[in-house]
């Protein structure tokens, strides 16, 4: 639920390595 400051419209979230995931074209951490 916390935005990770990264979008995932064109490329996947790089922040997945720190627990973030793509949701509604924005990377979130829980």
Swiss-Prot record:
Pfam families the record matches: Cyclotide (PF03784)
GO biological process, one term: defense response
Keyword Heme: no
Modification after translation (UniProt): This is a cyclic peptide.
Cross-link (Cyclopeptide (Gly-Asn)): 1-30
Expressing tissues: Detected in seeds (at protein level).
Cross-referenced InterPro entries: Cyclotide, Cyclotide_sf
Residue pairs linked by disulfide bridges in the UniProt entry: 4-20, 8-22, 13-27
UniProt xrefs under PROSITE patterns: CYCLOTIDE
Alphabetic keyword roster: Disulfide bond, Knottin, Plant defense
Highest taxon, organism lineage: Eukaryota
Function comment: Probably participates in a plant defense mechanism.
Comment, domains: The presence of a 'disulfide through disulfide knot' structurally defines this protein as a knottin.
Similarity comment text for this entry: Belongs to the cyclotide family.
Protein name stated in the entry: Cyclotide hyen-K
Originating organism: Pigea enneasperma (Spade flower)
């Amino acid at each position: 639920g916390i935005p990770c400051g990264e979008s995932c419209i064109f490329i996947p979230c790089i922040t997945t390595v720190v627990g973030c995931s793509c949701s509604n074209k924005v990377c979130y951490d829980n």
